[in-house]
């Protein structure tokens, strides 16, 4: 009954783009697969502390007999579609990966939760859509809110210093009134 969504994945470019519905389907399916494999292989006493990595999940799935594998993949795919419908509604065009309630980046100022609203408005950084995950280049973590990643990056041309590039997210200044407070954040 979810064949149309599987067909979308077959035609997908395999990029976890922030504007991709297929990326949203894939990431939710991956999450359901990992959760199901955790239930199956991690002892109850250790579940609070351990989770299987994708590489291990793929390895274990590849070693299953064909019927068990089909059952697992169908079950988790269907549950991923159910979860997406529950969270975002029946229309698949609402399942875009990079959105506020899915994959995004929101850096919180350390004082944001303790200051009044007028100061919070000055220091708070915006939320931006994000693509990728912890298994893609740029390693943006598997959290739906990117909480980690390379925020300081530098390419130095020692033969011509003026030809060097650097970025420091969210910006080069700690002063919220400066134009350089968050000028590098959106591109990060």
Language-model segments: which ranges?
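Long, compositionally biased non-active-site segments enriched in small/hydrophobic residues and glycine
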Residues: 1-188
């Amino acid at each position: 009954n979810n064949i149309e969504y599987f067909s979308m994945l077959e035609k997908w470019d395999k990029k976890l783009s922030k504007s991709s519905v297929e990326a949203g389907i894939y990431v939710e399916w991956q999450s359901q697969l990992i959760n199901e494999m955790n239930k199956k292989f991690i002892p109850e006493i250790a579940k609070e502390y351990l989770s299987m990595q994708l590489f291990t999940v793929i390895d274990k799935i590849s070693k299953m007999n064909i019927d068990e594998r089909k059952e697992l993949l169908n079950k988790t795919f269907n549950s991923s579609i159910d979860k997406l419908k529950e969270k975002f509604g029946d229309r698949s065009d609402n399942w875009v990966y990079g959105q506020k309630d899915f994959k995004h980046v929101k850096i919180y100022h350390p004082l944001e939760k303790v200051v009044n609203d007028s100061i919070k408005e000055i220091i708070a950084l915006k939320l931006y859509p994000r693509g990728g995950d912890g298994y893609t280049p740029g390693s943006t973590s598997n959290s739906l809110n990117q909480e980690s990643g390379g925020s300081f990056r530098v390419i130095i041309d020692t033969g011509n210093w003026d030809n060097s590039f650097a970025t420091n997210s969210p910006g080069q200044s700690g002063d919220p009134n400066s134009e350089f407070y968050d000028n590098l954040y959106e591109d990060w």
